[in-house]
A protein has these predicted regions:
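DUTPase catalytic domain/fold
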Residues: 2-175
Length: 175
C-alpha cells in the first residue's frame, strides 16, 4: 500500500511540474520584450496599471508648423502572436503644443526600430529632445481569423440584429 501511495505522489508531482512549465510558457509567450541599447530610452509605465508604455525620442529634432517628422526611438519590440502594438498620443503634447501623434501599428512579426510619426499642428516650431516622452505604446489582443459571410446569410443567421440596430454617430446622446 505504501508503494502505491509513493507512486501516486510521484505521478502527481510530475503532473504538477508539467502543468507549471506549461503555465510559465504561456506567461512568457504573452510578455512584451523591449530591446534597446540605451537604458535611458527604455519605455516605462509610471503606474503598474497604465495601459501604455511611454516611448522616448532617441534624437533631437525640430518640427516646423504644418510638417511631419518620423522620430527615431532606438527601440525594437517583440510582441507576442495574437497581439499588436498601437502607437498613441500623449495628451499633453496635443493640448500644450498642438503636436499630433499619427497612427502607428506594430505587428507581432515586426523587428526593426520603432519610429513615431509626429505632426506639428501648432503655429511654432516644436523641438523634440533626446529622452522626451513623445508617444505611448499600447499592446492589444487581436483576432487571428475571420469568417466572411454574404450579407443575406448574415441577416438570416441573425448576426445583424442588435438592440442598438443601425443607430450611429450621436445616437446615445450627450447626457
Amino acid at each position: 500500500m505504501a508503494a502505491l501511495i509513493k507512486t501516486f505522489l510521484l505521478l502527481f508531482c510530475c503532473m504538477a511540474i508539467v502543468y507549471l512549465i506549461n503555465y510559465l510558457r504561456t506567461l512568457w509567450n504573452k510578455s512584451v520584450i523591449f530591446v534597446c541599447d540605451d537604458p535611458n530610452l527604455y519605455p516605462y509605465k509610471k503606474y503598474r496599471t497604465d495601459a501604455g508604455w511611454d516611448i522616448k525620442a532617441a534624437e533631437d529634432i525640430e518640427i516646423e508648423p504644418g510638417k511631419y517628422a518620423a522620430i527615431a526611438t532606438g527601440l525594437r519590440v517583440v510582441i507576442p502572436e495574437g497581439y499588436y502594438g498601437h502607437i498613441l498620443p500623449r495628451s499633453g503634447l496635443a493640448v500644450k503644443n498642438g503636436i499630433m501623434t499619427m497612427a502607428g501599428v506594430i505587428d507581432s512579426e515586426y523587428r526593426n526600430e520603432v519610429k513615431v510619426l509626429l505632426y506639428n499642428a501648432g503655429d511654432k516650431t516644436f523641438e523634440v529632445k533626446r529622452g522626451d516622452r513623445i508617444a505611448q505604446l499600447v499592446v492589444t489582443k487581436i483576432l487571428l481569423s475571420s469568417e466572411l459571410l454574404p450579407s443575406e446569410e448574415a441577416i438570416e443567421l441573425g448576426y445583424m440584429e442588435t438592440e442598438r440596430g443601425t443607430s450611429g454617430f450621436g445616437s446615445t446622446g450627450v447626457k
